[in-house]
Amino acid sequence: MPAPGIFHVCWDGKVPLTYRPHNNGEHHDPTKNQTGSRLVYWRCDSRKRCWRGDYHDQGANHWIDDHIATPMSKYRDYEQSRQSFGINVLGTLIVEVEAENGQTGFAVSTAGEMGCFIVEKHLNRFIEGKCVSDIKLIHDQMLNATLYYSGSGGLVMNTISCVDLALWDLFGKVVGLPVYKLLGGAVRDEIQFYATGARPDLAKEMGFIGGKMPTHWGPHDGDAGIRKDAVMVADMREKCGEDFWLMLDCWMSQDVNYATKLAHACAPYNLKWIEECLPPQQYEGYRELKRNAPVGMMVTSGEHHGTLQSFRTLSETGIDIMQPDVGWCGGLTTLVEIAAIAKSRGQLVVPHGSSVYSHHAVITFTNTPFSEFLMTSPDCSTMRPQFDPILLNEPVPVNGRIHKSVLDKPGFGVELNRDCNLKRPYSH
């Protein structure tokens, strides 16, 4: 069992900290190393914004907060900005785990101070003292121990995901292998990406295979809203040409009737797919939308589904692509299981963003022919790592691609930026 530790922590209402048990100085066979939990609440003080663990927490004039349709858009007070209803309040959670030999693994998600509390006061008991390879055991214990308050995902699952990813990172570093090799190795030489952002035309110039735009209108806007978003797609089709993929991200903001009308309004412009039109649990709605969507247009969802069971039910609706976020769905351990469910039904699994935490998974999946890159620059004109500045050495696509050799570093191949202000609101 690791010796008692010291925590360095930081909290401003939205950022993460670091807990680090002392190394007891002993040396062990790496395969027998035990892990001590390390929780990181990282934050940047109010005078210097250092966001991006929570990529929604951006500054003014950023495309990601510019009149994007949401479930709250029907309330005029919260229509213009997603930050107005609090999309950025959770903040960043960083979890670190340390083996007895002093090696550490870490991961990033969104759960903020509340996630820190869950790890420190509850989940730590399932981590400390375990072998670094006991990832599935720890994962199962965390899931079952939180059933009585986790519901169908959300904050608790974000936290569990972060712990799981940190454990995979540590395991890879202990054995000296990239995570994708721990999963069985790459099935292709490179990952090709589409870009999510407001400017698919710029994404095309950067070498991406497609561009996914947010919708700006919803059912409360009636047919006028449908026409406005269809005009946006038509305009981008003219700019990008016929062969470039165009997709729409509806972010849970629609109902079946509106989504069906929007899909048909965009069909003349060769829309490749329409994404997450409905709230997560409206499975019958997704089934109906898929049944009535234009021929050749895919229906996709999954970003805000939080359990393996919810993905199994979603798969049964017949949608074309499932899109879990590895930082929210239960971690890499669950993502692998989701990919297997999708594969058994002939469906694709294309995770939502998540940078290296997705890269190491999707390059091993035979049913992930492409992946998502989230444009985090304010106007989508430059390439910026999703988790900058928290992660160091975070790769970005070159000409829309990342070669597997870029991932050939132990663990997830990134380091925690210790220049970010690290604090801890809780101890155990």
From Swiss-Prot:
Function: Catalyzes the dehydration of L-rhamnonate to 2-keto-3-deoxy-L-rhamnonate (KDR).
GO biological process: amino acid catabolic process; carbohydrate catabolic process
Domain of life from the UniProt record: Bacteria
Catalytic reaction annotation: L-rhamnonate = 2-dehydro-3-deoxy-L-rhamnonate + H2O
Subunit architecture: Homooctamer; tetramer of dimers.
Pfam families associated with the record: MR_MLE_C, MR_MLE_N
GO molecular function: L-rhamnonate dehydratase activity; magnesium ion binding
Alphabetized InterPro entries for the sequence: Enolase-like_C_sf, Enolase-like_N, Enolase_C-like, L-Rhamnon_dehydrat, Mandel_Rmase/mucon_lact_enz_CS, Mandelate_racemase_C, Mandelate_racemase_N_dom, RHMD-like
Keyword Transcription listed: no
Active site location: 352
Listed CDD domains: MR_like_2 (cd03327)
Positions marked as site (Transition state stabilizer): 372
Miscellaneous: Reaction proceeds via a syn dehydration.
Residues that, per the record, bind substrate: 56, 82, 372
Cofactor: Mg(2+)
EC number(s) recorded for this UniProt protein: 4.2.1.90
Protein name as catalogued: L-rhamnonate dehydratase
Cofactor note: Binds 1 Mg(2+) ion per subunit.
NCBIfam families linked to this entry: PRK15440.1
Site (Increases basicity of active site His) residue list: 325
